[in-house]
Amino acid sequence: DVERSRGLGDVYKRQDVDVTKGIIHHEEGLDLMPCNIDLSGVDVSLVNAMSREFVLKTYVESMREFYDYILIDCMPSLGMITVNSLTASDRVLVPVQAAYLPVKGLEQLITTIYRVKKHLNPQIQFEGILISMLNARTNYAKDIMELIKKYYGESIPIFESKIPFSVKAAETSAAGVSIFTLDKKHPVAQAYEKLTKEVIAHE
């Protein structure tokens, strides 16, 4: 069993955290480091911390030897957790829902990424922009895709893969399984498989 007190909150709040604690070994071949309620207070706890932008990077560097890939999933926020995640990363994949407000917020995120690249992590590169929750049958979604290509297509790669909107895919969280376990032939599963191949091809 995973120690419930362990998680990303511990990584941010304790310099002496045991890097092997709090990791869940999932039957589908992935290791997960979940967050807990402690993560909600991280921005406040890091206000006076030394090298506060590099806390997660220090942890990630200690884990690199054990993994081929380490994926950091960020909440839609521009706070210290996101800055830490960008500082710790080699590449950044930017998912954006095919809707007006998420695309409008994309500008702020990309500005933050460029600032991190300039001041904290010169090595970080854009993996690309991934359009998600797409209903390709609507003119609205097509207009959103054209908008993304117009403003970002020349400077940031845009994945050919698109993740379609699906209620069934959303149900995977409640079921506690991936879309591949639920239905590996589902369009969302096929889209993620295509995306994975596209990402690997970029290496």
Regions found by a protein language model. Give the residues of each.
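Hydrophobic side chains within well-formed alpha-helices
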Residues: V19, R52, L56, I144, ...
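Single conserved hydrophobic/aromatic residue that forms the stacking wall/gate
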Residues: D1-Y12
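Short, glycine-rich, amphipathic interfacial segments at transmembrane boundaries or analogous
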Residues: P164-E171
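Conserved catalytic-core segment of NTP-binding enzymes
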Residues: R64-P164
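Cytosolic-facing regulatory segments adjacent to core modules
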Residues: V17-G22, H26-I72, P76-L78
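C-terminal alpha-helix
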Residues: K194-E203
